[in-house]
Amino acid sequence: MKNLKPLFLASLICATGLNGCDDGTGVVFAILAAGAATGLKNALDNGDDETNTSSDASTSSSSSQQFEILSTQYYDGVNDDLLTAGLGQNGLMGAAPAAADPENPTASEIRTATIVNQYQASQDRRSTSGYGTLYGPAAKTQFATPSADGKVAGKEYFAYADEGRGNQNVTMMVQVPSDFDRDNPCIVAAPAPHSQGVYGAISTVGEWGLKNHCAVAYTDKGMGNGVHDLNTDTVNRIDGTRGIATDLGKLSHFKAQGSAEMDLSAYQSTYPYRIALKSAHSQQNPEAKWGQNVLEAIQFAFYVLNLEEESGEASAADPDKTDANQEDEQTTATLKSTLTASNTLVIAASLSSGGAAALRALELDNQGLIDGIVVAAPMINPRDLDSAEGVTIKQGNQTFVYQRYRKTVFDVITYYNIYQACASANTTMGLHGRCIALRRAGLIDGNTLTTQVADAQRLLNLYGTLETTNVIAHNYEAAFVYASLANVYANAYGRFSVVDNLCGYSYAGSEGDGSPSAKSLSDLADDYQSGNGLPNSSGTDLINNEGNEEEGINFRNSVDANGELEGDLKGALCLRQLATGTSGTLNNTGIPLTGEASARYQRVQDGILQIFASGNLRGKPTIIVQGRDDALAHVNFSARAYYSLNKSTKSNSQLVYIEVKNANHFDGLNQQYNINTQIPLYYYLNQALDRMYDHLKNGTSLPVSQVIPTVPTASLEERLPEIDSEEHCEITFSDDVLTIPEC
């Protein structure tokens, strides 16, 4: 259990900020030696230590860490609040309020719309699914009873983490609720899922943290909705408002760069109306730094909590400096840390890629900042096991040998990007023409649409995926999940510029099968609040540059030389080659790439080498919750593989794996597509957070690894058995065999 020192609580006041408080001056504070911000060089040392190397992380370094607070705002919990933007639980069920001027929304209007849209994307907000009773802003947790409308008063702080040149500008946000308990302090680190912005985890982990009186430390992991419209040369600020790229300079959330062969001006002339997205075109390979980003967000949270206004104890300041003569310069306030890693409970938690970031943060954390981890559906890439045989996964009468499931996320997504459009062709979500094009290329068998669809599905399941994912994958195809992620990951891993047009793709606004066109000012203003950092969203489409006689076309409307509407199979095969290094669709098949194609492949593979997870959780308690029907982070390649790596290499493992039947990656899609055969995975993420909090605070036992047999067609009270209920089926690991019961 964490040893929590008694401290005192003082009221929150509104400090200096941009677009929220009075004068807009950024203030720099430095924390010295006392240690809420431990030296990152040491904190990020990825040694193979099983546990924390320091007995007291608060005094382990004499280094200083600086954060420039770009914006602060206090919310009263009535007219506006931290969690629901003043709308309350019921208000989040409707559409986001429209801005008074849609072309120039204020930072406040953008924030409100962003929070509403995050709830729409992340939660199934149907009362029949449990919204408002089992989960949601006003729903009780094991340790908290929120207000009737779920509103939370408190203060919000923004800052960038950057190398000093504005190239990274990882957005961090800390929310401190007014009922933050300094006698029992806790921090929840909540990295954004997917490619979403810094508010991405507010509707899941942020909600749990604020309801339980914890400060919440968010990070966009160096991705987020950074949109550079090359047509207008406008970019986002940290708060989502837009300005001219050259005017904003290092304060831009993201500004695209050209290449030695082509600058942005020449590119815009050749490919008009194009868009650069930070998630794809930052040229930073942000995933390589996800763990570091989470640790930086935790450091920022400690920094904020130790500000004098948050009841931190200020040490001796310069008596000759007054507020008046400090007004026009950056001010350094030295703080004595009262809240440190040794007396504050820290849980890192999120879902999807945010879950992967949390796991990798703990792998890096040799200073003991993090006490426990809870993640759902992590998009994790486990490193290879030393043994060629690895671990065997058994589920019922199915056996998955190591060589069948040791695949990266990029490998699986690029494979699905080829075949899923055909596998879905018997639904309204697929493409008949993709099946015909695949048959012509000799990549599937069958002379009828029915047999071709069946063969495409057979190939996908042979790749190591579960048949229970097949139906939900149709919805992912309809949402362009595979094509969007395949393109974004390829660009990010290879550090490609927007001007490189990797595999003949770009991003732009378009209408139907028309050529790219200028995005309206209202569409650009909407990107931050309704986009998810990926095409196709908020009017930004994935463009096949060869369509419409090389003027470009929405990739989905691409027509091949035979007149088939087939969704640009050529581009999909090009992206697949970046995973295989050959002309084949399977690894170790086809002809090896040469020349420029080989060089592109090597760039992508070099980036992937930087993102593997070690599986070393330093003996810290960790819970992974995963939906069995996840058709993105397929269980065999992600959660099961990571659990196997950890269990087979770490004798002091406290990792718990909970697999939930009839649950998938995107709760929001359950509502969007009116899916009633899937249950909300978020409900079990909440339960796992309660169990972890109870374990760390009170020493209760962690749950056993298990399968939870949900029953989507039962009544709300009966469809969702609790963790460790008598209905659960235990997962076992012995002699390098992971046994998953059908349950």
Spans of features found by a protein language model:
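Short hydrophobic alpha-helical membrane-entry/anchor segments
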Residues: 22-26, 36-51
